């Protein structure tokens, strides 16, 4: 356990390093401390911090830099969220103050705003709502043998996919299939639609016999509607935060964050303490060597009965944590407010 003075010195080292990205010496610490301590005493205390593995020496300087353990101690015990500058509050409000037609548009915009504000890579996952249901299914002709399948969800979102009709299927048969699908699926929660539902439709003489490919299309549209949407923005910002120029590593990292399933696993908060609104995982804790020099700042937002979602920032390990935690605490509330405003239109 550290003394109060040792904690203050560790906090000073981390805050200075996240600003300058340069090793921190005892004189720098002495000039920034809020208490009067001699340089010799600070050197002794820094030696204790080094023995605990909380700071480490670099080869190129006599100063010290925080270790992963040092950052973790700071995040668990010392960090305090900073209030955002007034202009940043205004910027967030201004960029959210526009008409949105779907939940996905709001979530996608959230990722873009976060990335623009921080110059980091931002993730935004839409709220997972187990209670949304199908309110309509339509087939719209576009060309002689091309139609669009449109699925309307109770939260106001719309999913669609193009479908090319096989030559043996007539327009009347497609309309019959659409009517049957409406009868079977409209009003059902997405969470209730499963493999058995589609097996029943496949066994139908109208749908399964004449348009099995059409059912595959429908199944694809429904799976897309039921899955939480993940949006990533600022991928190229990774290049500013990669400490080596290994092209293979850069490519692998880019592929990692652009994979919805892998990104979803990355920002999964299921094993994080629920009493913290914002969580930070350091590179060594992310269980992926590609991310060892990064940190992930995550926050969950809630839109009541409409579900919960997650936002996250992927940036360098030496990011200014107080500022980023303060930003995420505020942003998650603003995103939830915007989504609740949207859902309120469908009451």
Curated annotation (Swiss-Prot):
Single GO term (MF): DNA binding
Gene3D superfamilies in UniProt: 3.30.450.40, Heat-inducible transcription repressor hrca homolog, domain 3, Winged helix-like DNA-binding domain superfamily/Winged helix DNA-binding domain
Pfam families (UniProt xref): HrcA, HrcA_DNA-bdg
GO BP: negative regulation of DNA-templated transcription
Keyword presence, Transcription regulation: yes
Assigned keywords, A-Z: Repressor, Stress response, Transcription, Transcription regulation
Source species, domain of life: Bacteria
Matches recorded under InterPro entries: GAF-like_dom_sf, HrcA, HrcA_C, WH-like_DNA-bd_sf, WH_DNA-bd_sf, WHTH_HrcA_DNA-bd, WHTH_transcript_rep_HrcA_IDD
Disulfide bonds: none
Family matches, as HAMAP family: HrcA
Biological function: Negative regulator of class I heat shock genes (grpE-dnaK-dnaJ and groELS operons). Prevents heat-shock induction of these operons.
Similarity section: Belongs to the HrcA family.
Protein name, as recorded: Heat-inducible transcription repressor HrcA
Species this protein is from: Lactobacillus delbrueckii subsp. bulgaricus (strain ATCC BAA-365 / Lb-18)
Lineage: Bacteria, Bacillati, Bacillota, Bacilli, Lactobacillales
Originating gene: hrcA
């Amino acid at each position: 356990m550290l003394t109060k003075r040792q904690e203050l010195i560790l906090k000073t080292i981390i805050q200075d390093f996240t600003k300058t990205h340069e090793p921190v010496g005892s004189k720098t610490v002495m000039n920034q401390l809020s208490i009067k301590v001699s340089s010799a005493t600070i050197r002794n205390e820094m030696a204790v911090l080094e023995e605990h593995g909380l700071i480490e020496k670099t080869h190129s300087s006599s100063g010290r830099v925080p270790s992963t353990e040092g950052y973790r101690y700071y995040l668990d015990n010392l960090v305090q969220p900073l209030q955002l500058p007034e202009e940043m509050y205004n910027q967030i409000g201004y960029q959210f103050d526009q008409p949105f037609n779907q939940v996905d548009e709001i979530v996608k915009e959230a990722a873009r705003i976060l990335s623009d504000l921080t110059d980091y890579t931002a993730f935004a996952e839409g709220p997972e709502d187990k209670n949304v249901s199908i309110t309509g299914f339509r087939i719209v002709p576009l060309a002689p043998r091309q139609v669009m399948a449109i699925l309307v969800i109770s939260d106001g979102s719309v999913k669609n996919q193009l479908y090319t009709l096989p030559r043996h299927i007539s327009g009347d048969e497609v309309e019959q299939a659409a009517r049957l699908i409406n009868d079977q699926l409209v009003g059902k929660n997405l969470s209730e639609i499963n493999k058995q539902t589609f097996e029943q439709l496949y066994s139908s003489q109208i749908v399964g016999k004449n348009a099995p490919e059409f059912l595959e299309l429908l199944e694809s549209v429904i799976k897309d509607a039921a899955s939480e949407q993940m949006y990533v923005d600022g991928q190229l910002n990774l290049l500013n935060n990669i400490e080596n120029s290994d092209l293979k590593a850069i490519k692998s990292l880019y592929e990692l964050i652009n994979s919805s399933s892998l990104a979803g696993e990355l920002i999964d908060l299921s094993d994080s303490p629920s009493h913290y609104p914002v969580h930070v995982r350091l590179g060594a804790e992310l269980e992926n060597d590609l991310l060892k020099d990064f940190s992930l700042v995550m926050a969950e937002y809630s839109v009541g009965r409409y579900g919960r979602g997650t936002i996250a920032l992927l940036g360098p390990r030496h990011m200014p944590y107080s500022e980023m935690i303060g930003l995420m605490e505020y942003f998650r509330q603003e995103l939830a407010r915007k989504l609740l405003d949207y859902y309120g239109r469908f009451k």
